[in-house]
Amino acid sequence: MRASMFLALAGLVLLFVVCYASESEEKEFPRELLFKFFAVDDFKGEERACKGVFDACTPGKNECCPNRVCSDKHKWCKWKL
């Protein structure tokens, strides 16, 4: 009887420790996600040699990346079909 009570108590303590550890990881996840987002956002300031899909362009100037063309109607780069 005494051994089963000890095992039950040890199991509850172990369950508490596991739940606490997973909860603390969940609290850190949004913070890590924001840090990663802003770290990637720093690279967006660099100028590219060509323009990607949906970037503004001037028709006839060939500013878009390969396999893309500047739309005369919308004035942005789109996939060449």
Swiss-Prot record:
The protein's name in its UniProt record: Mu/omega-theraphotoxin-Hs1a
Region forming the signal peptide: 1-21
Propeptide: 22-48
Annotated disulfide bonds: 50-65, 57-70, 64-77
Phenotype when changing residue 68 to A: 92% decrease in bioactivity
Similarity comment: family membership: Belongs to the neurotoxin 10 (Hwtx-1) family. 23 (HwTx-I) subfamily.
Gene Ontology cellular-component annotations: extracellular region; host cell postsynaptic membrane; host cell presynaptic membrane
Record localization: Secreted
GO terms assigned for molecular function: calcium channel regulator activity; ion channel inhibitor activity; sodium channel regulator activity; toxin activity
Organism: Cyriopagopus schmidti (Chinese bird spider)
Tissue specificity statement from the Swiss-Prot or TrEMBL entry: Expressed by the venom gland.
